[in-house]
């Protein structure tokens, strides 16, 4: 490969181990699984570490394949490493801890919003590249993002004001289903 970022692909029909009869047998073996997942909703959640490790493009290729097989996808991403890095860059003396609920000040909330927006745009851009040099090249994947989560403020607990900290109250499932009905991720 001339560019280390390019993903090398080989046509299954050209690979020696996939002679036409072998390919047909393999295809027949996977067909029931394809039928089983078509139309199902998969929620794919991953942490910000995946993006930090530059594995987003590989994930997008896999998700595009699932989408092409008729799987409806809901993608949920984390951002802890990126938020902590942004807080450090801005000189804010706070680090988010996974699984720990702490009061969220306005400046911390702003960092969280900036990072979440940046990651969302990175994900959308990865899907919008047309997946060059992959078996999914020229596929059109549509992304719909929105405020599908309704939050509930934590409020004051044991005399501690949790400021802008919230927890999930509910998900707007009707809006998610409408987006999925449009064959969007």
Model-derived features with residue positions:
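Terminal amphipathic helices with adjacent charged low-complexity linkers/tails
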Residues: 81-83
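A sequence-level detector of short, solvent-exposed, charge-rich linear segments
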Residues: 42, 46, 56, 85, ...
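Active-site glycine-centered loops adjacent to acidic/histidine catalytic or metal-binding residues
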Residues: 78
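Ligand-binding beta-strand-loop-alpha-helix segment within the catalytic cores
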Residues: 17, 88-184
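Glycine-rich loop at the start of a catalytic domain that most often binds anionic cofactors/ligands
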Residues: 55-61, 85-94
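N-terminal glycine-/serine-/threonine-rich phosphate-binding loop
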Residues: 1-75
């Amino acid at each position: 490969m001339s560019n280390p970022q390019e993903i090398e692909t080989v046509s299954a029909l050209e690979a020696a181990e996939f002679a036409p009869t072998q390919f047909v047998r393999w295809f027949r073996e996977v067909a029931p699984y394809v039928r089983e997942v078509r139309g199902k909703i998969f929620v794919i959640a991953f942490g910000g570490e995946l993006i930090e490790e530059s594995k987003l493009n590989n994930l997008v290729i896999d998700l595009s394949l699932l989408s092409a097989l008729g799987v409806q996808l809901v993608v949920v991403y984390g951002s802890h490493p990126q938020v902590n890095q942004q807080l450090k860059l801005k000189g804010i003396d706070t680090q988010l801890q996974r699984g720990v609920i702490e009061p969220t000040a306005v400046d911390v909330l702003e960092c969280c919003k900036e990072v979440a927006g940046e990651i969302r745009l990175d994900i959308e851009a990865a899907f919008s590249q047309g997946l060059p040099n992959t078996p999914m090249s020229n596929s059109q994947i549509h992304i719909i993002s929105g405020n599908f989560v309704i939050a509930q403020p934590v409020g004051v607990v044991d005399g501690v004001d949790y400021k802008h900290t919230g927890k999930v109250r509910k998900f707007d499932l009707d809006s998610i289903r409408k987006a999925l009905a449009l064959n969007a991720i």
